[in-house]
């Protein structure tokens, strides 16, 4: 399958992936509008992976990892970057073939390129999630993570959800043959050429400065406590509200990540904070599952 989009631009590559997975049958949803560390934290993955209701979603997700910032000086380390996420439940038997089809569409002939699936089981302690997985290496560079979810929020995933996560910047750097993410051609149209650096370099410099030097530590500690308290209250209601509670959990997790960037948390404290977030996520997962069960798992009736 070919595409009408120019995959030699970052923009065109994303549009091509959206087109490809839409044709497979995925619903293309929009990025989650809060700070998350990975596409997995989007509710369409983290919560929809629970319970028996089938799903098929694909989306771009901006991801923030404050400790990964390098003041815009490192050619491939960013505190804000993009993932393309595909989640299908139950995971189709041919999901690897579908993935390889997406690489072909981007111009990679599997007979001409070294494409390897390297076993790499995945775990997210704060989500209480883990899965069997593989890294996909393209000519020696990791470009994708494959995961078959086994648990989220400590609950078993039945049936198993298949997740494909593309590292968009890495994949684009390979396609375009550049050594610095800032040299990527983001778009190239009638109004001229725009690079990734044009769009994001100043943001990397300033956000790194904020994350490491100026984020208010006292405020972040208080914010964590407040978000934790709100999440607990929402889950303790007679009719719990798992979706708003989950948003509070994500806010708490981002506050923790910012404290980590500020080096405000010791190694032992760090583990305690992770366990606190994990406990909240477990509560959200149980409440979400119960809410769908109370509705009779309506997605199963389609």
Swiss-Prot record:
Location (main, coarse): cytoplasm
Gene3D superfamilies per record: Bira Bifunctional Protein, Domain 2, Class II aaRS and biotin synthetases, domain 2
A Pfam match: tRNA-synt_2e
InterPro entries linked to this entry: aa-tRNA-synth_II/BPL/LPL, Gly-tRNA-synth_heterodimer, Gly-tRNA_ligase_asu
Keyword terms, alphabetized: Aminoacyl-tRNA synthetase, ATP-binding, Cytoplasm, Ligase, Nucleotide-binding, Protein biosynthesis
Enzyme Commission number, as recorded: 6.1.1.14
Record's GO cellular component terms: cytosol
Catalytic reaction list: tRNA(Gly) + glycine + ATP = glycyl-tRNA(Gly) + AMP + diphosphate
Cellular localization per UniProt: Cytoplasm
EC primary class: ligase
CDD domains per record: GlyRS_alpha_core (cd00733)
GO molecular function: ATP binding; glycine-tRNA ligase activity
Record GO biological process: glycyl-tRNA aminoacylation
Subunit structure: Tetramer of two alpha and two beta subunits.
Family membership noted in the UniProt record: Belongs to the class-II aminoacyl-tRNA synthetase family.
NCBIfam families cross-referenced by the UniProt entry: glyQ (TIGR00388), PRK09348.1 (NF006827)
UniProt name for this protein: Glycine--tRNA ligase alpha subunit
Source lineage: Bacteria, Pseudomonadati, Pseudomonadota, Gammaproteobacteria, Pasteurellales
């Amino acid at each position: 399958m070919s595409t009408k989009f120019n995959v030699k631009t970052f923009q065109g590559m994303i549009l091509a992936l959206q087109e490809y997975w839409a044709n497979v049958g995925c619903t293309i949803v929009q990025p989650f509008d809060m700070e998350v560390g990975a596409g997995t934290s989007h509710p369409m993955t983290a919560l929809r992976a629970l319970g028996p209701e089938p799903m098929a979603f694909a989306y771009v997700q901006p991801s923030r990892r404050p400790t990964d910032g390098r003041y815009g000086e490192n050619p491939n380390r960013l505190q804000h970057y993009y993932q393309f996420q595909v989640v299908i439940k139950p995971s189709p038997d041919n999901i690897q073939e579908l993935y390889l089809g997406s690489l072909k569409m981007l111009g990679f002939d599997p007979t001409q390129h070294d494409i390897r699936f390297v076993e790499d089981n995945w775990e997210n302690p704060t989500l209480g999630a883990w899965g069997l997985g593989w890294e996909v290496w393209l000519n020696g560079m990791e470009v994708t993570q494959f995961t078959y979810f086994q648990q989220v929020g400590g609950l078993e995933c039945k049936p198993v959800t298949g997740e494909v996560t593309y590292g968009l910047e890495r994949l684009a750097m390979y396609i375009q043959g550049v050594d610095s993410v800032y040299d990527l051609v983001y778009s190239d149209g009638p109004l001229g050429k725009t690079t990734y650096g044009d769009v994001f370099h100043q943001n990397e410099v300033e956000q790194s400065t904020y994350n490491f030097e100026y984020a208010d530590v006292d405020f972040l500690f208080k914010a964590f406590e407040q978000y934790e308290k709100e999440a607990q209250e929402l889950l303790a209601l007679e009719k719990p509200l798992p979706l708003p509670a989950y948003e509070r959990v994500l806010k708490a997790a981002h506050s923790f990540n910012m404290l980590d960037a500020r080096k405000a948390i010791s190694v032992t404290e760090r583990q305690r904070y992770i366990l606190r977030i994990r406990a909240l996520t477990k509560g959200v997962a149980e409440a979400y599952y119960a809410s769908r069960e109370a509705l009779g798992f309506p997605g199963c009736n389609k």
